[in-house]
Swiss-Prot record:
Keywords: Amino-acid biosynthesis, Cytoplasm, One-carbon metabolism, Pyridoxal phosphate, Transferase. Its EC number is 2.1.2.1. Catalyzes the reversible interconversion of serine and glycine with tetrahydrofolate (THF) serving as the one-carbon carrier. This reaction serves as the major source of one-carbon groups required for the biosynthesis of purines, thymidylate, methionine, and other important biomolecules. Also exhibits THF-independent aldolase activity toward beta-hydroxyamino acids, producing glycine and aldehydes, via a retro-aldol mechanism. InterPro entries: PyrdxlP-dep_Trfase (IPR015424), PyrdxlP-dep_Trfase_major (IPR015421), PyrdxlP-dep_Trfase_small (IPR015422), Ser_HO-MeTrfase (IPR001085), Ser_HO-MeTrfase-like (IPR049943), Ser_HO-MeTrfase_PLP_BS (IPR019798), SHMT-like_dom (IPR039429). The gene is glyA2. PANTHER family: SERINE HYDROXYMETHYLTRANSFERASE, SERINE HYDROXYMETHYLTRANSFERASE 1. This is Serine hydroxymethyltransferase 2. It is an enzyme of class 2 (transferase).
C-alpha cells in the first residue's frame, strides 16, 4: 500500500493527536518564555512545503545537484530580504540554528585554542559564548566578563580590562538573559584596541532591531549572528550577517562545507517569508507592543505588594522583550515560581540570576518574555491584566487562590484564537 498521499491524521493518529494537544495548550494559556514566539501560518506553510524533498548543497547558482532552479530562487530571496531588513552587505541564511551560526562564525575566524571573551552564562550569556561543556569552551580558550554586583549591568570598563588582560581573538556581545541594551560602539572600540573580531549574537533581540525599537549592531560588529525565531517570529533557524567581503567568503565556506551539508530549503523558504513579514508596518507595531508589554510587567512587579514578598526585578526594569525576576529574597525559588505560574496556565522558565546561590536546575529567578503575546495581538491593557495575574500568582498565599487566576488566564487567552485553520473538528 502506497502511503505517499496519506494525511498525518489518517496514517499516524498518535502523532496527530499530540500535535493537536500542543496546539490547544499554546492557545489556552499564555506563552511567556522569552525565547518562544508564534510563527505565522504563512511561515509554517512554507516550512511544510515540498521544498523539504530537495537536496541543494552549495549556494545559489553554484550547486552540486541538478534541479535547483526554484531552491535557488527561494534562497536568493531570503538573502536579499534579510540584507535589506538589517542593512547588511552579506548574509548567509543556511545555518540550521543560532548555535550552528555561532559555531560556523568561530570556525571561519578562529583557530582551535584561540581565546574568546563573552558574557558569563551565569550572568546572562549563552552556552555558545564559551561554556566549558559546549563546543565554544572545548575548542577555544574561553574567558568571560560579568555584570556588576552593584547594578547588574555589563561594566564596559571591566570588559575593556578583561580584553587587555586576555587579548582575545574574538569578543562576543550578546545574551540569553539580560534585560538591557548593550553598547555596541564601545564593544567595537574595545575589540579594535586588542585587534579582536567583534561578533554580536542578536538572537534574542533581532526582531526589535528589525522594527527599529532597538539599536542595530550591524554597523558596529565584524559579524552578527541570530536565530530567526524568538522576537523575529520566523521558523527555527539561524543567519549570519556581515559587511566585509573577505569575512563573508570565510563564513560561507565555514557553513558549507565546513559545518553543514545540504541546506534546509523548506526552512529557508520560511525564513524568507518571515523576513518579508518583519519588513511590514504591522511588525514594527507588534515589536513596540512587545517592548511596552515587558516594561508594563516590570513596572507591576516592582510595586510594594510584590516587593514586600522579597520579589525584585533585576536592574529595576527592562529595555528589551524580557523581564528577569530576582527571587533570592523570596519564599519561592525559581522552580517553585515556574510551577506556580504553570498552575495558572502561564508558561515561563526558571532562570539563574547573577551571583545565584541556588543550583542551575532550581535557580533564584524567572525569565518572562512578551513576544508571543504581542504576536497574538495583546494590547497594553491586556499586558496590564497579565502583569496583575502574574503578580497575584507569585504572591498567592495558598493554592486555593490559583484556581480563579487560571480561569482569568483562560478567558483572556480565549479572546485571541490561535491558528483557527489548524483546529481539527
Amino acid at each position: 500500500m502506497n502511503t505517499l498521499n496519506d494525511s498525518l491524521t489518517a496514517f499516524d493518529p498518535d502523532i496527530a493527536a499530540l500535535i493537536d494537544g500542543e496546539l490547544r495548550r499554546q492557545e489556552s494559556g499564555l506563552e511567556m518564555i522569552a525565547s518562544e514566539n508564534y510563527a505565522p501560518l504563512a511561515v509554517m506553510q512554507a516550512q511544510g512545503s515540498v521544498l523539504t524533498n530537495k537536496y541543494a548543497e552549495g549556494y545559489p547558482g553554484r550547486r552540486y545537484y541538478g534541479g535547483c532552479e526554484f531552491v535557488d530562487g527561494v534562497e536568493q530571496l531570503a538573502i536579499d530580504r534579510v540584507k535589506a531588513l538589517f542593512g547588511a552587505e552579506y548574509a548567509n541564511v543556511q545555518p540550521h540554528s543560532g548555535a550552528t551560526a555561532n559555531a560556523a562564525t568561530m570556525h571561519a575566524l578562529l583557530n582551535p585554542g584561540d581565546t574568546i571573551l563573552g558574557l558569563s552564562l551565569a550572568h546572562g550569556g549563552h552556552l555558545t559564548h564559551g561554556m566549558r561543556i559546549n563546543f565554544s569552551g572545548k575548542l577555544y580558550h574561553a574567558t568571560a566578563y560579568e555584570v556588576s554586583k552593584e547594578d547588574y549591568l555589563v561594566d564596559m570598563d571591566a570588559v575593556a580590562e578583561a580584553a587587555r588582560t586576555h587579548r582575545p581573538k574574538m569578543i562576543i556581545a550578546g545574551w540569553s538573559a539580560y534585560p538591557r541594551q548593550l553598547d555596541f560602539a564601545r564593544f567595537r572600540a574595545i575589540a579594535d584596541e586588542v585587534d579582536a573580531v567583534l561578533m554580536v549574537d542578536m538572537a534574542h533581540f533581532a526582531g526589535l532591531v528589525a522594527a527599529g525599537v532597538h539599536p542595530s549592531p550591524v554597523p558596529h560588529a565584524h559579524v552578527v549572528t541570530s536565530t530567526t525565531h524568538k522576537t523575529l517570529g520566523g521558523p527555527r533557524g539561524g543567519i549570519i550577517l556581515c559587511n566585509d567581503p573577505a569575512i563573508a567568503k570565510k563564513i560561507n565556506s565555514a557553513v558549507f562545507p565546513g559545518q553543514q551539508g545540504g541546506p534546509l530549503g523548506h526552512v529557508i523558504a520560511a525564513k524568507a517569508t518571515a523576513f518579508k513579514m518583519a519588513a511590514q508596518p504591522e511588525f514594527a507595531q507588534r515589536q513596540q507592543r512587545c517592548l511596552d508589554g515587558a516594561r508594563i510587567l516590570a513596572g507591576r512587579l516592582t510595586q510594594p505588594d510584590v516587593a514586600e514578598r522579597g520579589i525584585a526585578v533585576l536592574t529595576g526594569g527592562t529595555d528589551v522583550h524580557l523581564v528577569l525576576v530576582d527571587l533570592r529574597d523570596a519564599e519561592l525559588d525559581g522552580q517553585q515560581a515556574e510551577d506556580r505560574l504553570a498552575a495558572v496556565d502561564i508558561t515561563v522558565n526558571r532562570n539563574a540570576v547573577p551571583f545565584d546561590p541556588r543550583p542551575p536546575m532550581i535557580t533564584s529567578g524567572l525569565r518572562i518574555g512578551t513576544p508571543a503575546l504581542a504576536a497574538r495581538g495583546f494590547s497594553h491593557n491586556d499586558f496590564r491584566a497579565v502583569a496583575d495575574l502574574i503578580a497575584a500568582a507569585l504572591t498567592a498565599t495558598n493554592d486555593d487562590q490559583l484556581g480563579p487566576l487560571r480561569a482569568q488566564v483562560q478567558r483572556l487567552a480565549a479572546r485571541y484564537p490561535l491558528y483557527p485553520e489548524l483546529h481539527r473538528t
